């Protein structure tokens, strides 16, 4: 799938990995719809890139449908979905005062796993109704998991479960959508320069970066976007989760 003239719907596109992907798409001739809850940042970036912004809670069917509809209305189609929206918490299964709050666990799984699936099913439905390109492709879907899906740390039960679910559904969804000419892959980033990590003191950031075997630094959002581009452009990449982590394997804590 060529980036040029493809229409992108990017959840969590107002910042971090999603924003870098939106910039990559626009710089290479793609048309971008940023779907996010951050109206100010998302709207500003969309305007800068000549794209559109949709306020979108990925767990909402109505919001998801509206974001897809905006892409179809404004740009005449939808070829690429990149799921970057997500949340994280740190909470042990049994705390000092009480067991893990069930509502907080449910919220993380709902946003990260169910929210991703919600956007996949809605975007894929729109993609499947369009005509294929010369290679028979109708669309590409890129999800975001995490190395926590494999190396979940202490306090990451909810987050690891949610991202493990994203990894687990990648292959079956790719197989489901193969007859429609839609490819599905997932990126599992390691420790990256996201807004959350950049809020830490510089010493803490450097310490985290040194845990990465090579290169011994935090990953850059542009590197995530670079891999997303490779997935989109390579027709044979399908049904796979790719770790983007500098060979790190997370310690228990």
Placement of each model-derived feature along the sequence:
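Catalytic Tyr-x(3-8)-Lys segment
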Residues: 110, 203-223
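Residue(s) in the substrate-gating loop at a strand-loop-helix junction
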Residues: 146
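Alpha-helical segment proximal to the catalytic Tyr-Lys
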Residues: 125, 174-176
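C-terminal substrate-recognition "lid" of short-chain dehydrogenase/reductases
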Residues: 220-244, 249
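Conserved mid-core segment of classical short-chain dehydrogenase/reductases
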Residues: 88-106, 125, 129-135, 155-158, ...
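Catalytic Tyr-X3-Lys loop
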Residues: 87, 98-118, 142, 159, ...
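Canonical Rossmann dinucleotide-binding motif of NAD(H)/NADP(H)-dependent dehydrogenases/reductases
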Residues: 2-33
């Amino acid at each position: 799938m060529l980036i040029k003239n493809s229409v992108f719907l990017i959840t969590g596109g107002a910042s971090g990995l999603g924003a870098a992907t939106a910039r990559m798409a626009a710089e290479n001739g793609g048309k971008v719809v940023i779907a996010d809850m951050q109206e100010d940042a998302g709207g500003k970036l969309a305007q800068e890139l000549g794209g559109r912004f949709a306020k979108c809670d990925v767990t909402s069917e109505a919001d998801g449908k509206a974001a897809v509809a905006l892409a179809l209305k404004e740009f005449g189609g939808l070829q690429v979905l990149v799921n970057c929206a997500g949340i994280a918490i740190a909470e042990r299964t049994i705390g000092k005062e009480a067991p893990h709050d069930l509502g907080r666990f449910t919220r993380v799984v709902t946003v990260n796993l169910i929210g991703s699936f919600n956007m996949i099913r809605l975007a894929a439905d729109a993609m499947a109704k369009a005509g294929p390109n010369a290679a028979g492709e109708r669309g590409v879907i890129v999800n975001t998991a995490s190395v926590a899906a494999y190396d979940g740390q202490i306090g990451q039960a909810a987050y690891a479960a949610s991202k493990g679910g994203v990894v687990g559904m990648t292959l079956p969804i790719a197989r489901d959508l193969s007859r429609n000419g839609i490819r599905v892959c997932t990126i599992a980033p390691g420790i990256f320069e996201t807004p959350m990590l950049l809020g830490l003191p510089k010493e803490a950031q450097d310490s985290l970066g040194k845990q990465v075997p090579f290169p011994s630094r935090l990953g850059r959002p542009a590197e995530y976007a670079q891999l997303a581009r490779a997935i989109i452009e390579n027709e044979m990449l399908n049904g796979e989760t790719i770790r983007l982590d500098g060979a790190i394997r997370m310690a228990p804590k």
